[in-house]
């Protein structure tokens, strides 16, 4: 029910608690559609509850809530696979999540941590769905240039990244508190990390990177 959704989101999703009531309501309208279009699969014996689905769906929908097209942006997206913790290890480090355009994989431990704290700049679900938005562009590539509301906005962002990305790589590790320097890995990761920061540390991000914001 809508009341149950509200209670679950209020208890688990910090970004939801910060939203005005009208946006909360608009988000709750999107959630059942998202849940219904996605194939959900628990890995390594992980059991996915309805509450988990609602919370993940909410965070997946937040980035498209105000975009023209809304859920249509996820038209090619198909499935979510959830692991208890890390997906795998790479060079001794755990992989918390990944995305390939049609599928997202999430480590629940890290997804839950990102939901609960809406001000630390870390949000695994939003990060991975920023990649899905990126993949949904006309070229089908995750290259840090998603499809914006208009062609001119898309071109402006493409030019901005082309002109400034080397500066991002140099500066991300220096006195930067608004988002993870993992964003300097490539243009796609910059877009995903910037999207996390836009929602989690908006004021700080705007102060440090006003043009990107």
Cite the ranges covered by each PLM segment.
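Generic beta-strand structural signal
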Residues: 78-79, 102-104, 122
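N-terminal topogenic membrane-targeting module
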Residues: 1-36, 41
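Hydrophobic (often cysteine-bearing) scaffold residues that line and stabilize catalytic clefts
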Residues: 23, 52, 118-122, 188
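Active-site recognition of the HExxH zinc-binding catalytic motif
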Residues: 20, 120-137, 192
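Metalloprotease/metallohydrolase-associated module, dominated by Zn2+-dependent proteases
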Residues: 35, 39, 54-74, 85-116, ...
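Short, charged early-sequence alpha-helical segments and their helix-coil boundaries
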Residues: 42-53
């Amino acid at each position: 029910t809508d009341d149950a959704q509200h209670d679950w989101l209020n208890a688990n999703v910090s970004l939801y608690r910060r939203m005005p009531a009208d946006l909360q309501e608009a988000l709750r309208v999107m959630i059942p559609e998202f849940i219904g279009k996605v194939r959900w699969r628990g890995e390594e014996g992980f059991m996915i509850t309805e509450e988990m689905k609602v919370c993940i769906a909410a965070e997946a929908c937040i980035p498209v809530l105000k975009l023209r097209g809304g859920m249509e942006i996820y038209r090619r997206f198909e499935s979510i696979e959830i692991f208890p913790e890390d997906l795998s290890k790479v060079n001794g480090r755990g992989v918390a999540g990944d995305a390939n355009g049609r599928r997202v994989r999430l480590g629940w431990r890290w997804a839950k941590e990102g939901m609960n704290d809406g001000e630390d700049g870390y949000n695994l679900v939003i990060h991975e769905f920023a990649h899905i938005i990126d993949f949904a562009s006309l070229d089908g590539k995750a290259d840090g240039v998603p499809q914006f509301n208009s062609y001119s906005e898309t071109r402006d962002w493409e030019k901005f990244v082309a002109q400034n990305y080397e500066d991002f790589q140099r500066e991300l590790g220096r006195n930067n508190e608004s988002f993870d320097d993992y964003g300097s890995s490539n243009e796609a990761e910059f877009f995903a990390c910037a999207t996390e920061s836009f929602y989690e540390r908006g004021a700080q991000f705007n102060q440090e990177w006003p043009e990107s914001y």
